[in-house]
Amino acid sequence: MYHTQGSRTTELAQAALDGARGVEETETTLKRAFDTTADDLLAADAILFGTPENFGYMSGALKDLFDRTFYACENKVNGKPYAVFVCAGNDGSGAVFNIDRICTGLKLKKACEPVVARKVNTPEQVEAARELGATLAAGIAFGIF
């Protein structure tokens, strides 16, 4: 799930989706943060969170998702793998840190290092997002996570 008001985060979300869909043993869904519910999080085998960096933090919409779903998911998603991608105007560290902190509270398990695209999406960063999606899906398909 992701949020964006521009094209950069959408580009990375689509790349991650393409990577995940390359793993035939899994079913992948792409949802916007505002359209995601606690039931979606509970039903997922893994979760990939994507956001722009806004003022050194995650987007308000992604924070809203956590606010709306935290207590419904608390102690029900323990150990579920997650990963993060961030489109950053700065270094993305604030967004990553705070997403990780909330995910720690949910007892989610960090499966991969974050992908942070700084300033503009380079072909390498788009490929990194594709690989992130593929890695998360393959980890689920083959019981690694």
Where are these regions (language model features)?
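A short beta-strand-loop structural module common to alpha/beta enzyme folds
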Residues: 23-35
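Short helix-capping segments at alpha-helix termini
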Residues: 19-26, 74-76
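Short histidine/acidic/glycine/proline-rich micro-motifs that form metal-
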Residues: 3-7, 55, 86-91, 116-122
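Helix-loop-strand module that forms the ligand-binding subsite of alpha/beta enzymes
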Residues: 33-112
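N-terminal beta1-alpha1 ligand-phosphate binding loop
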Residues: 1-23
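Residues at alpha-helix caps and immediate loop-helix transition turns in enzyme cores, especially N-
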Residues: 12, 61, 95, 125-128
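Alpha-helical elements of Rossmann-like donor-binding domains used by nucleotide-donor carbohydrate transfer enzymes
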Residues: 15, 64, 98, 128-131, ...
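Glycine-rich phosphate/pyrophosphate-binding loop and the adjoining helix
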Residues: 23, 37, 109-145
